[in-house]
């Protein structure tokens, strides 16, 4: 291969155009006719030296190294603090100053000495330089000490002069006060004030001064000097004496300068003393312009009014300031910091020390805020935010009037399928149970029935375990509880729960033993079982009425109604029949054609169409009233359930309602309640999020989450579904209801489910067209239900699918090693006796020595009578070769096991 390099090849090597390379060669003094000419190594080095000189570098690497040895670069970093003013506060900022300096050693420095110095000479030179440096430092210290001494002497001299001036001014002030006190004696006419010794010279020149000459009298009035003036008060004379002394001039009573005349124009009725006093109040001296008094006020450079004024407006507190902070139900950290006059970070830091992790924008409850306030040294008081609630209470008190007897409110309670709704059907002579999905009641039904014994309002509550809150709500608003117990089934869990609700509400109990017409009915068993729940029948010496009835044939229904009427008479139920109405929401729903619908039970007053009412966090005007038959009554009195249309939203079941005079008050009360509820919910959600984070930190990634969106026809069903499904959560899976509501499944519900990968549960509702489109496009799991049993079962199945499978180990057999043989093919072979179960060649094994696992692996061979077998059962001998393990000893046990997958369930 030729070592010659052409210009073209060199241009390719250095990645430079051929024309440019030819130009550079020509500039370097080398002529070439074309790109195909050969370039020698000498010419290459010559070109390289030319290019280095052009760029300001050494021609050769040796020269570059020599130049680098003559240079030294020093980098210096210095940290310092700079104070920056930010408004009224000052902030300290850390600043890093970086300096870079390059020193070049000149050629004559190295050539200044022909021969290098000996070590002794170098040591002497270093000592001489050190002594010179020490002398320079000593001289500098002496110079600084001398300048400090001169400065201190100058400061001390100025302080002495200022103190002497203050002493002279104090002596002059005391002399002036004594002279003013002597001149304050009653005199027949005002006379000129006696000049003090210090003011003698200016007083002698006073007549020649044109500004001190008396002015001619003003037209239309006497001159101030000739007008009688009121006697000046002692303090006014003292002030005037001060100004006379400090101003070093004499003021004659009634003679004023031009500046004073301008200032008091239109106030000629004032005396000289009053003018002097007002001048002092305004902070301006009463002396003539140009005098020392008007120029500098007093010897200290301050106005004379400051000498007589009280303390200044702000004094730095010497003790910690304890503030009284008003805190509501919730408060944000930023608002609390503002009330405490602290930075938000300080409050957040105090919360962290107390174990509460919160940001500056997060809301905290009253107890936490009170604790951190006391921790910071201040006092916390509860803020009174019940302004609108007080107005609402005043409205309720105004509605008091004459009371009349009202119908009783009777709640039918009991276990599921014990015949509660069927009994009410017979009383109403209608069929209601057939209209309920699955034949069970899934929301509170409110009815009022006119019987021969008067009007009775009935509330039919669900008996399923999921509707605990509904039954508790029904017990709170009722007067009498009728406990329905099937004679053939006895006391069940929801029966006991209903008894507990009735006792907690303090409501009298009447037991209706239903299904008495069936063959297996045993009323005595029911009485004995209820006796364990402290419900004692009258024939057992108790006070509870037991009525045997049959909802199918009507046996004992009249006796039950008589018992209800008798109990109502004993209770003497009364209420105000006229005036503003108030009561409780029994159930609520969202009707697509009518809007929010609330079933309410009126407890006081009369509810009429057009009334403004507040219902929890909702408000509105009553547009229409409907009873359980669909008719529109003119009004609803006490103990009458009706449906109300016209609210701003769907209220929660169990909320109280009250009628107010105007819509403004109703809106204010509803908004205040909503604000409080939202703040409380934020505090609770923040706490739950923190608990979830801590729980996840402790559990790792083991817990699965199933997100749900629940929509139902009525509020009570939503509440029951949420409680029942969330209760399915355990340490392995968590049921999370991300959204719930009343009404059909809308587009926003579908979007929310798609974003969070949630399952939509529609209970007696359906999805609209837009929601179905989103569900289909995003693959959202949408399920419709009408019976609460099915909802719970389906969610259990879905949750169990998320749990996956559990791997379990099952021991199949155990072999006892009796002796160990050696094999050229397998190594150590254990002669064993199967003492338990069966040993299979395809299963994994463990080797146990003294009941301790020493090896885990698999079998390499399993033989019986020199034949390979797949398994050996209990009581037989065999030879076992363990794969990759030769340390088998007599007395060991070989355990054969298998791994099986078990589906996990809730």
Curated annotation (Swiss-Prot):
Major localization class: cytoplasm
PROSITE patterns per UniProt: G_TR_2 (PS51722), IF2 (PS01176)
Keywords: Cytoplasm, GTP-binding, Initiation factor, Nucleotide-binding, Protein biosynthesis
Localization of this protein: Cytoplasm
InterPro entries (UniProt xref): DNA-bd_dom_put_sf, EF-G-like_DII, EFTu-like_2, IF2_assoc_dom_bac, IF2_II, IF2_N, P-loop_NTPase, Small_GTP-bd
Region (G3): 460-463
GO cellular component: cytosol
Biased composition (Basic and acidic residues): 136-177
Region G5: start-end pairs: 550-552
Residue ranges occupied by any tr-type G domain in the UniProt entry: 405-574
Binding-site positions, GTP: 414-421, 460-464, 514-517
Coiled coil: none
Region of interest called Disordered, as start-end residue ranges on this chain: 134-250, 269-317
Region of interest called G4, as start-end residue ranges on this chain: 514-517
Feature: compositional bias, Low complexity: 178-232, 287-305
Record region (G1): 414-421
Disulfide links within the chain: none
Region (G2): 439-443
Single GO MF annotation: GTPase activity
Family annotation (SUPFAM superfamilies): Initiation factor IF2/eIF5b, domain 3, P-loop containing nucleoside triphosphate hydrolases, Putative DNA-binding domain, Translation proteins
TM segment ranges: none
Cited function: One of the essential components for the initiation of protein synthesis. Protects formylmethionyl-tRNA from spontaneous hydrolysis and promotes its binding to the 30S ribosomal subunits. Also involved in the hydrolysis of GTP during the formation of the 70S ribosomal complex.
Family: Belongs to the TRAFAC class translation factor GTPase superfamily. Classic translation factor GTPase family. IF-2 subfamily.
Entries under PANTHER family matching the protein: TR-TYPE G DOMAIN-CONTAINING PROTEIN, TRANSLATION INITIATION FACTOR IF-2-RELATED
Protein name: Translation initiation factor IF-2
Species of the source: Xanthomonas oryzae pv. oryzae (strain KACC10331 / KXO85)
